[in-house]
Design a protein with these regions (language model features):
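C-terminal subdomains that position terminal phosphate/3'-OH groups for nucleotidyl transfer/ligation
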Residues: 1-143
Length: 143
């Protein structure tokens, strides 16, 4: 995180040279370069994100450090609020149903499991239900 903040002002070429010169590990180099190249592309999507699930989909693939940097880079109070909501609330939301529950409902195990569980998570983030019973009702409704 500190490294990304310190090197944030460099252009991409300068950044790569600096990282190479100081012999940082590939993992750190990749994180810093990813921040420099990917985060600016995410900001417009995040600005237009209206629902908690949309905000989650945008920020979830990022490392914690990158999300914090998005917060630091955010210009508007609305964007800062979205990132804070993700860090404080959305990133901690979990669903109650698991694969075994899906099997119990007669759903055949496979790639569809992950899709169904993601759909449940997104619906939970958007406040469509709050408990296990709500998840079951919602699942029966969408299947």
């Amino acid at each position: 995180l500190y490294l990304m903040v310190i090197l944030e002002g460099l252009e991409i070429g300068q950044l790569k040279n600096t990282l190479k010169e100081f012999a940082f590990h590939k993992r750190e180099c990749d994180k810093v370069i990813s921040f420099k190249t990917d985060i600016p592309k995410l900001i417009p999507h995040l600005e237009t994100a209206a629902s908690p699930s949309h905000i989650y989909k945008i920020l979830f693939p990022l490392s914690y450090e990158a999300v914090v940097l998005v917060l630091l880079e955010a210009d508007s109070p609305e964007l800062k609020a979205k990132v804070k909501d993700y860090l404080q609330h959305y990133s901690r939301v979990q669903i109650h149903l698991k694969g075994e529950d899906l099997k119990g409902l007669g759903i055949v195990p496979g790639p569809r499991f992950q899709e169904i569980l993601k759909c449940l998570l997104y619906a939970r983030l958007d406040g469509k239900f709050k408990d296990r019973e709500g998840e079951l009702d919602y699942l029966k409704e969408i299947l």
